[in-house]
A protein has these predicted regions:
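Metal-dependent active-site segment of extracytoplasmic phospho-/sulfohydrolases and closely related
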Residues: 425-463, 601-604, 609
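Active-site-proximal N-terminal segment of extracellular/periplasmic enzymes that hydrolyze or transfer
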Residues: 167-220, 461
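Active-site nucleophile/metal-coordination loop of metallo-enzymes that catalyze phosphate/sulfate
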Residues: 197-329, 333, 478-515, 519-525, ...
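Juxtamembrane/disordered regions of integral membrane proteins
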Residues: 2-138, 153-162
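A long, amphipathic alpha-helix that forms part
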Residues: 375-376, 380, 388, 396, ...
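Acidic, His- and aromatic-enriched active-site or binding-groove loops in soluble protein domains
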Residues: 243-256, 317-320, 385, 418-426, ...
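His/Asp/Glu-rich, glycine-adjacent segments
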Residues: 161, 165, 244-411, 553-560, ...
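Active-site neighborhoods of enzymes that stabilize oxyanions during catalysis
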Residues: 266, 270-279, 285-288, 292-299, ...
Length: 727
């Protein structure tokens, strides 16, 4: 028999197998730590009370379940209590094995374990518990979900919706050992997508946001409005906030003539392209920060659910596994997700029956999108932020899209939108309470990327979409657009789901490869979407469409792709006589911005012209109703890469401050008018604000100064050259 080398495990042993499989050693260590973790957690009165309460609630739910599920029976209530205790012990002991099994198969494994692990553990508990009879696995599967529904309902009634217990249980499942204490403060930046400063001020005064209201009333934090320049959209604002540069983002979607492609920032490849142009390696999160659920990474070394990062290669789903295998994670969120979809159907019908105007049709597809993004992904985001707080991450930036998502479809000040805002406030309160037990002190900064404006859509008001109006006027000018692209969809509503699907595509292994091919069409492909291989440069190709109308809220960029470069007003008038005057006089259009060969950028209204370069106004100023920053915003926007041949902004209703979106959204942002440019920043009161905050790039510089104030960013490398983009 051969002698094994000293200290080398025998070939036939489990340790020997682990030695030959590097990834397995961690799994074996996890298996050994499972029971140790369960017994090592310190016990105190609060934990004892919480544990006893959890056992009683789960036992009550299971007693009810056994009485309604065929194939299940128990002789006495104490047998059920014993089964609950056994299930808890099995869950704690098998956690590392379940996590390893899930990770071996990537996201599919995680989801399968999330769906079936609770049922399998409950089935084992039934089998080994005396005097409980179960007719196979499927009665146990049904019982696991019915009991979960009852448990969630009871827990919600007992806790009044507080999420602290949910988060603490998940963190116990994702325990990462003791982290040394650090004195240097960390910073958690929470973006509440689409929240306007006036709305937050009202919500604080009303007390409907207890956490933020308490901070501001107590004087620990200060509310500072900031101006989101045109275009007030998430990609432009996040490029500015996270990378300090948004000059290459003229809208949510735009056309690049030199490459013959439509860029849509909610597409992962396009988001990656945008970040490559914006990043210099010194983004907001470059100093060991974490990006969670954003469009761009901010140069963070670690990012999750970040749309631009999908092309960086696969990452293991270990950070997600605790959420999906915990009975307090995926099971709870899945049930609440279904409830959210039902709530959306009810609220949409109620809005319709009450005759609330303006409103849009809220489809079943949106109900599913809302349910996934506002429950499942919000819970997942919260767990990820909490995990990195407990690991002592230096800085964390997370975007919560709950409010923005609902406000687009219901209206920014409608009841269901405000309820979503209250939910985000609860999350902030939970994270702040958790941070008190973190290995370093944390400061919280809350901000928005833009606001929202309300109004009936352009199509609702005038019976036809903007692209049809432009096409009709071109035909009247003797040059009908026989081939055109109308980019006026609602891809922004799918952005949170796109982030999740992009994360799925990142996973290693067989399942990751399969999912990458199957999900490509879902998260990427659409007519005219960005394709790097299409970039040719030079003159536009003959087969290019005659017209492209790319809408972002109540702002539209109009391109004539068969004419290379950006057309001047004189060239447009030559090619399409009368088009500019007809557009400027349309009742649904507030103004048209174009560039002249003599005066540079000008704004045309139905009764006047505003020359942006000189400030000279002829007739009635078309920007008079749009606020004091309008001219400066448009002058800056005119210098953006790939801005349209024409920039069209909708009308603004003087009595209500409502706009007319060129997309089918009742709440919108992207142009001028209403609250869409009035973003907000809530920060520690002791942190000074160095002047008026105009634009996301300015806010980025302020955030960087604050990070430097607490000791961050001292060791960052010099900036790298940005990727240039032709105009």
């Amino acid at each position: 028999m051969p002698v094994q080398p000293e200290h080398e495990p025998a070939e036939g042993t489990l340790a020997g197998w682990a030695g030959r499989h590097p990834g397995a050693s961690r799994t074996l260590e996890d298996l050994g730590r499972g029971w140790a973790l369960f017994t090592r957690q310190g016990w105190n009165r609060q934990r004892v009370v919480a544990t006893v309460a959890a056992v009683l609630i789960n036992s009550l739910a299971l007693i009810v379940t056994i009485n309604v599920v065929p194939g299940l029976s128990a002789s006495a209530e104490w047998d059920v209590v014993l089964a609950v205790v056994l299930a808890a012990i099995l869950t704690a002991g098998l956690r590392p094995a379940l996590q390893a099994l899930a990770l071996a198969f990537g996201w599919v494994g995680v989801l399968v374990v999330g769906l079936f692990a609770r049922a399998a553990i409950l089935y084992l508990a039934f089998v080994v518990t005396p005097d409980i009879h179960v007719d196979g696995f499927w009665p146990a599967f049904a019982a696991s979900w019915i009991a979960a529904i009852i448990t969630i309902a009871i827990s919600w009634l007992v806790s009044a919706g507080d999420e602290t217990e949910f988060l603490s249980q998940l963190l116990m499942f994702s325990h990462h050992g003791r982290i040394p204490h650090q004195d240097e403060p960390g910073v958690v930046i929470v973006q509440i997508d689409g929240l306007a400063a006036p709305l937050l001020q009202w919500a604080v005064v009303s007390g409907n946001l207890p956490t933020l209201s308490r901070w501001i009333r107590a004087g620990s934090h200060r509310l500072t409005p900031w101006h989101a320049q045109v275009p007030p959209t998430t990609p432009a604002s996040q490029a500015g906030l996270l990378h300090g540069n948004n000059r290459g983002v003229p809208a949510f979607r735009w056309f690049e003539k030199d490459a013959g492609r439509l860029v849509v920032s909610s597409k992962p490849k396009d988001a990656a392209l945008i970040e490559s142009r914006m990043s210099d390696g010194r983004g907001l999160l470059a100093d060991n920060g974490v990006s969670i659920s954003n469009l761009f990474s901010g140069d963070a070394p670690v990012s999750h659910l970040t749309l631009s990062g999908f092309a960086l290669g696969g990452r293991p789903a270990r950070s997600f596994a605790a959420f999906f295998i915990s009975p307090y994670g995926f099971t709870r969120s899945f049930i609440l997700t279904i409830g959210e979809a039902v709530k959306e159907v009810y609220q949409a019908r109620r809005q319709r029956l009450r005759g609330i105007e303006p409103r849009i049709r809220r489809s079943g597809v949106f109900a599913a999108q809302r349910a996934i993004s506002n429950v499942l992904l919000r819970d997942l985001n919260t767990v990820l932020v909490a995990q990195y707080i407990m690991r002592g991450a230096k800085s964390i930036f997370c975007d919560y899209t709950d409010y923005d998502e609902i406000a687009h479809h219901a209206g920014p000040t409608r009841a269901e939108s405000l309820r979503a805002l209250e939910g985000v406030d609860r999350v902030i309160g939970t994270l702040a309470a958790l941070a008190a037990h973190a290995p370093r002190p944390y400061e919280f900064v809350i901000l928005s990327d833009h606001g929202q404006s309300q109004g009936a859509t352009f199509r609702q008001r005038y019976g036809t979409p903007l692209e049809e109006v432009v096409r009709g006027l071109m035909a009247g000018a003797g040059s009908p657009a026989t081939d055109s692209i109308a980019a006026t969809g609602t891809e922004e509503a799918r952005t949170p789901v796109s982030r999740f699907l992009a994360e799925v595509r990142q996973q290693h292994g067989m399942v990751g490869m399969l999912s990458r091919s199957k999900l490509a069409a879902v998260v990427e492909e659409e007519p005219g979407a960005a394709r790097p291989e299409a970039a040719q440069g030079g003159a536009a190709r003959p087969e290019a469409p005659e017209l492209v109308v790319a809408a972002s809220g109540n702002l539209a960029l109009v391109y004539f792709p068969r004419h290379p470069g950006r057309l001047t007003a004189e060239e447009i008038e030559t090619a399409y006589p009368g088009l500019l005057a007809e557009l400027a006089s349309h009742p649904g259009i507030g103004f048209v911005c174009t560039r002249t060969s003599s005066d540079g950028p000008v704004v045309l209204g139905c009764d006047g012209v505003h020359r942006l370069g000189s400030g000279q106004i002829t007739g009635v100023d078309p920007l008079a109703a749009f606020g004091p920053q309008a001219a400066a915003d448009l002058l800056s926007h005119d210098s953006c890469d790939h801005v349209g041949d024409l920039v069209i902004n909708s009308r603004l209703d003087s009595g209500t401050d409502e706009v007319a979106a060129f997309e089918e959204l009742v709440g919108c942002h992207g142009g001028l008018g209403g609250w869409q440019g009035r973003a907000v920043l809530v920060h520690p009161a002791t942190w000074p604000v160095d002047g008026e905050l105009i634009g996301a790039e300015c806010v980025h510089r302020q955030l960087v100064r604050w990070l430097e104030r607490v000791g961050h960013r001292s060791d960052l490398a010099p900036p790298t050259a940005r990727v240039t983009s032709s105009v």
